[in-house]
Design a protein with these regions (language model features):
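Glycine-rich, proline-tolerant flexible connector loops at the mouths of alpha/beta enzymes
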Residues: 51-79, 125-130, 184-197, 245-247
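Hydrophobic faces of well-ordered beta-strands that scaffold small-molecule active sites
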Residues: 15-19, 58-60, 95-97, 118-120, ...
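Catalytic cores of alpha/beta
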Residues: 97, 102-115, 173-174, 206-211, ...
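Glycine-rich phosphate-binding active-site loops on the catalytic face of alpha/beta enzymes
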Residues: 113-131, 182-194, 219-222, 232-256
Length: 270
């Protein structure tokens, strides 16, 4: 386990819960009538429910900003900073941020809000719904350090959603190479889209080649599968399973979140 990962999450297998912000100003699905206060109110409700359920950490993301872009609008990043700032006094667990699909904006948002970790696609070469995808880990990680946040833990998603890798190497080889070349603090394995599970066989294959690097399930972990996932992986990021009816775009269901954490604690032996 890497030092930064341990410092942020402790020695266990963390459950990182998503706070999916509503569509931000400028995005096609933004609710202009409810405006910024609506974004804050909805995020506060989800954050409160997740923390009451006992999640280990939360991550703020802009999954509702569809169609997605590789370079986030400045207003989107600023709005995310505003919402997180309004909630900062209520956040009682480590928190992270992710501005889809923009590593530079994600780093800037983390620096502005004091986030402990970030998630993004930092490496690889993909064909995606958004077009050709060629992130630049070297540029992003250097930007983190220029912002004075060398302490920021980096969670690298090595199997991008909404995309197909153009790299002919196997997923374990891509993950192993990313750890060697681009110094992540953890590696994430995803399903095809938000809410769809990563294959347990993929998690196991990546973990087998990275015994000293945290490997987390990034998508699609459900109540029925969290035990099996945490048997293989070093933690998980979960969003859809904690929502009303298990639907990604619904608010958090306090009862579903509490039951998920009960199952996670049992799987972790506590």
């Amino acid at each position: 386990m890497t030092e930064k990962f341990r410092k942020v999450f402790g020695g266990g297998k963390p459950v990182i819960a998503m706070v999916h912000l509503g569509a931000l100003p400028g995005a096609p699905l933004h609710d202009a009538e409810r405006g910024l206060e609506g974004l804050v109110d909805d995020a506060r409700q989800d954050l409160t429910a997740l923390q009451a359920a006992g999640v280990d950490a939360v991550m703020f993301g802009n999954e509702n900003d569809r169609p997605y872009e590789f370079t986030a609008d400045t207003a989107s990043t600023a709005t995310m900073a505003y919402v997180i700032g309004r909630l900062r006094a209520l956040i009682a667990v480590p928190f992270g941020v992710n501005v889809l699909w923009d590593p530079m904006s994600t780093m800037a948002l983390a620096a502005a809000t004091g986030a402990a970790f970030v998630r993004e696609i930092f490496t690889g070469h993909y064909a995606s719904d958004m077009g050709p995808w060629t992130p630049d880990a070297g540029r992003a990680v250097r930007y983190r350090n220029r912002l004075g946040r060398s302490d920021l833990a980096l969670l690298y998603n090595v199997s991008a959603e909404f995309a197909w890798s153009l790299d002919r190497r196997s997923l374990p080889d891509r993950a192993r190479s990313a750890v060697f070349s681009s110094i992540p603090d953890a590696v994430l394995v995803s399903g095809a889209i938000t809410g769809e599970p990563a294959e347990l066989s993929d998690l196991l294959a990546v973990k087998n080649v990275l015994p000293d690097t945290p490997v987390l399930a990034n998508t699609g972990v459900r109540h029925e599968t969290v035990g099996d996932v945490l048997h293989v992986a070093d933690g998980c990021i979960v969003g859809s399973a904690l929502k009303v009816d298990g639907h990604t775009w619904n608010p958090v269901d306090p009862a579903r979140a509490a039951e998920f954490m009960r199952l996670a604690r049992a799987a972790r032996g506590g």
